[in-house]
Swiss-Prot record:
It is found in: Nucleus. The keyword DNA-binding applies. It holds the Pfam family Homeodomain. It comes from Oryza sativa subsp. indica. PANTHER family: WUSCHEL-RELATED HOMEOBOX 10, WUSCHEL-RELATED HOMEOBOX 11. This is WUSCHEL-related homeobox 10. Keywords: Developmental protein, DNA-binding, Homeobox, Nucleus, Transcription, Transcription regulation. The gene is WOX10. Belongs to the WUS homeobox family. GO terms for molecular function: DNA binding; DNA-binding transcription factor activity.
Length: 284
């Protein structure tokens, strides 16, 4: 009897050890083997300053950055919060998908409008008399077209900026309504907000609807790109950042370098012709 009990206990012990080993190996096989699969990609919620930079880069034409460009963009975004190369890659991938979907929607809307033109023309002709059509051009505004108080210079736009880049509400109409492929919670309101107080700086915005004014470049100015939009800035001397954009704003070069200013809020170095800069807020 003792030998039988001992044998039964040994069999049960071995079975328990085998079950324990199987339980320990189950997570490894579930994740793709003993080597361990890649961790699940977590949802990244970029900050407003990071979205502003990403949208500016995308609107400037860089819609599919290479690996080295992705790393450079990631280093620029890290100034405002934690981010990985994978986050940047998937942001651009998702952004391209939304742009293509938006383009298809616009194409369908234009096609429907073209089909309605013949009937509209026939209705106008039936009304009698020569029809008169007046197109009122609504000038687009740019959130970064600002007038400085006191001795601050004036920064003016030299191109008819796209509605996406010129609107203070970046891509509010292109953000998905919570779909599965919308990886990021895109903010619907972007841009720096003017602060009120002792040193008020008004953020004004305007754009001349006259086409001749769009091609005019004042003497003594250079053209730079701020947030993907071309602007004329004074070529001589440094730009008064505090007087033009407010003390809460700073300029970041496309290389990731923050442009230094003195105690009066004036750039120590002048802006360079044709260079790309990003206007962001110091407060995160």
């Amino acid at each position: 009897m003792d030998r039988t009990a001992t044998a039964s206990w040994e069999v049960m012990s071995r079975r328990g050890e085998q079950q324990q080993q199987l339980m320990m190996q189950a997570p490894a096989s579930h994740n793709g083997g003993s080597g361990g699969g890649e961790p699940a990609r977590s949802r990244w919620a970029p900050k407003p300053e990071q979205i502003l930079i990403l949208e500016s880069i995308f609107n400037s034409g860089m819609v599919n950055p290479a690996k080295d460009e992705t790393a450079r963009i990631r280093r620029l975004l890290e100034r405002f919060g934690a981010v990985r190369d994978a986050n940047v890659f998937y942001w651009f991938q998702n952004r391209r998908s939304r742009s293509r979907r938006r383009a298809r929607q616009l194409q369908q809307a234009c096609g429907a409008a073209l089909h309605q033109l013949p009937s509209a023309a026939a209705a106008a002709g039936a009304g009698g008399g020569g029809g008169y059509y007046h197109h009122h051009h609504q000038p687009s505004s740019s959130p970064f077209l600002m007038h400085g108080g006191g001795g601050g210079g004036v920064v003016t736009s030299t191109t008819a900026a796209p509605a996406v880049a010129a609107s203070g509400h970046f891509l509010a109409d292109e953000v998905d309504g919570g779909g599965d492929d919308d990886l990021f919670a895109i903010s619907r309101q972007m841009g720096l907000m003017a602060r009120h107080g002792g040193g008020d700086h008004h953020y004004g915005s305007y754009a001349d609807s006259d086409a001749t004014q769009l091609s005019y470049q004042p003497t003594g100015t250079i053209q730079v790109f701020i947030n993907g939009v071309a602007y004329d800035v004074p070529s001589g001397g440094a730009l008064d950042m505090a007087g033009t954009f407010g003390r809460d704003a700073m300029l970041v070069h496309s290389s990731g370098e923050v442009l230094p200013v003195d105690e009066h809020g004036v750039l120590i170095n002048s802006l360079q012709m044709g260079e790309c800069y990003y206007l962001v807020s110091k407060s995160i």
